[in-house]
Amino acid sequence: MTAAGRAAIALAGGPSGAPAGPGALAELIGASLYDAVTRHRTRYLAAYELALESTRQPALAGAMSRLGAAALGSTLAEHRSLGLPTTPGQVQALIALYNSTLMTLVVAPPGTVTAEAALVLARCLVTGVLRPEVDH
């Protein structure tokens, strides 16, 4: 995450410097999804191709696993730096849902995904993950 991204989400938490909340997190994720689908579309298509190839090559699978673990650690650290109270399990769920959402968006025809659509999906993602667990 860039310094500008951290500043934007920190500001979204409120002028008092309060920690960022779910709304700010959804805004950040929505912007990230849209940026990935537009400016970095080819990069993410290649990353998904690589992930699929890792199912056939054990050495690549190991490297992808290490990459995933590093992504979890760095994302959790970013959440802490922003004052987000997400648990490691919630961060892992956010990453999984982000990747699934990004895959859906990146295979859509170029130019068809809007920033608003990415934000709606991001809000659903954050709401679902951060919702208090309900006893069954």
Give residue ranges: language-model regions.
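A short secondary-structure junction motif
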Residues: 4-11, 74-78, 101, 105
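Short juxtamembrane and helix-loop transition motifs at transmembrane-helix boundaries
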Residues: 24-28, 51-54, 121
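Charged catalytic carboxylate motif
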Residues: 28, 46, 70, 93, ...
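Short alpha-helical scaffolding segments that buttress acidic/His motifs in well-ordered protein cores
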Residues: 33, 47, 51, 94-101
